[in-house]
A protein has these predicted regions:
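Active-site PLP attachment segment
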Residues: 217, 223-258
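Structural motif of enzymes handling amino- and sulfur-group chemistry
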Residues: 271-291, 302, 307, 311
Length: 401
């Protein structure tokens, strides 16, 4: 039998040959619109820190104060002795913010999805997924033991056809992101809810990229569409617009009690550090405030400005989020474009298979409230020049689907 290094080395060589080999670049600064890499400053257009809270003084003060009081590590899982006081405060704020009866916090959005899905359904049940649902949703579905059905992206006719044939299953769970993480487009929640009601299914939504950004109260897309009360399970993250780390689920108290008792990713994980939990509580309070409203509005002004700039370059974007995908196609071409931008001081890593389908590599450009007008113009100018220079080998377009 070949040894481990020989076999894994061969797999790595295949990744390199296919333009799929991944490396890590160390960032030697706080997260923000400008970051330091290898001693050089770069404009960062790849962050999910949409509201610029990751380095906000308010959150840093909350973190420092919590470290002074609670130390660093939680010491155990939440169900042993790791459920320090900031957890109750954060969960109360999340429930109030999301206008739900109860909330429960997980160590990450990934853990929240996997733990929730596996706690809700199993053998004898069916999960119906959008083809572009996040990997954490797919992994949770696979681990659950339930039957999995997948419908083409946002194809309501196919979703209806699948649900019509699932009447013999004990439980039917539809799961969709509200803002899709790689394309930046929005789920048709109204229509999905009609099908949920028609076929007696449950609906779970992942508001990871919507929390803090949409609707009057900034609760997410479900609020914007006016359907919050019709959703069975709402998931979100603390790591994107809220600038921290972790994931959460909001809903009925019965739901959160069930997850506390059944979600293995919660039960068997050491709790998040209390300082991060305290910072997340401060972030939720900020997002609910008038200052949070103003920060959100600044984000959308920047999104509009960048989309208008891309339009002037002939790239029309259908994105209705801060995620603006620039479709390249071939993995090698996407890597080349990303490296050319990096040489010019723009940090936008290429997104490749398996994160997106083969042949649909892209630049996933993200905008934050912290970017200045000068930052946006600098990106547009450099991107325009690079696109012309390598245009013979790169077919550039906005929105891959």
């Amino acid at each position: 039998m070949p040894n481990l290094d020989d076999q894994l080395g061969a797999e790595l060589e295949q990744l390199q040959a296919g333009g799929l080999y991944r490396t890590l670049r160390a960032i030697a600064s706080a997260q923000g619109p400008r970051v330091i890499i290898d001693g050089r400053e770069f404009l960062n257009f790849s962050s999910n820190d949409y509201l610029g809270l990751a380095d906000d003084p308010l959150l840093k003060r909350a973190t420092i104060n919590a470290v002074e009081r609670y130390g660093v590590g939680a010491g155990a899982s939440r169900l042993v002795c790791g459920n320090l006081a900031p957890y109750a405060d954060l969960e109360e704020k999340l429930a109030r913010f999301k206008n739900k009866e109860s909330a429960i916090v997980f160590g990450s959005g990934y853990a929240a999805n996997v733990g929730t899905i596996t706690a809700l359904v199993g053998e004898g049940d069916v999960i119906v997924l959008d083809k572009l649902d996040h990997a954490s949703i797919i992994d949770g579905a696979r681990q659950s033991g339930a039957t999995i059905r997948v419908y083409p992206h946002k194809n309501l006719k196919k979703l209806s056809d699948i649900l019509e044939k699932c009447g013999t299953f004990r439980r039917r769970l539809i799961i969709t992101e509200t803002v899709f993480s790689m394309d930046g487009d929005l789920a048709p929640l109204d229509e999905i809810l009609e099908l949920k009601e028609k076929y007696g299914a449950w609906l779970m939504i992942d508001e990871a990229h919507a929390t803090g950004l949409y609707a009057k109260n900034r609760r997410g897309l479900a609020e914007a569409v006016g359907v919050e009360d019709k959703i069975d399970v709402t998931l979100g993250t603390l790591s994107k617009a809220l600038g921290c780390a972790g994931g959460f689920v909001v809903g009925s108290r019965v739901l959160t009690d069930h997850l506390r008792n059944k979600a293995r990713s919660l039960i068997y994980s050491t709790a998040m550090p209390p300082c991060i939990v305290a910072a997340a509580g401060a972030a939720v309070e900020f997002v609910m405030s008038e200052a949070g409203h103003q920060r959100r509005d600044a984000l959308w002004r920047n999104v509009s400005e960048l989309k208008n700039g891309l339009s002037r370059l002939g790239l029309q974007s259908a994105s209705r989020s801060p995620i603006i995908p620039i479709a390249i196609g071939a993995e090698s071409a996407a890597m080349e474009t990303s490296e050319k931008l990096f040489e010019q001081g723009i940090f936008v890593p290429a997104i490749r298979f398996p994160t997106v389908p083969k042949g649909k590599a892209r630049l996933r450009v993200t905008v934050t409230a912290s970017h200045t007008a000068a930052d946006l113009q600098q990106f547009l100018s450099i991107f325009a020049a690079i696109s012309k220079r390598i245009g013979s080998t790169v077919a550039v377009g906005v929105n891959p689907e």
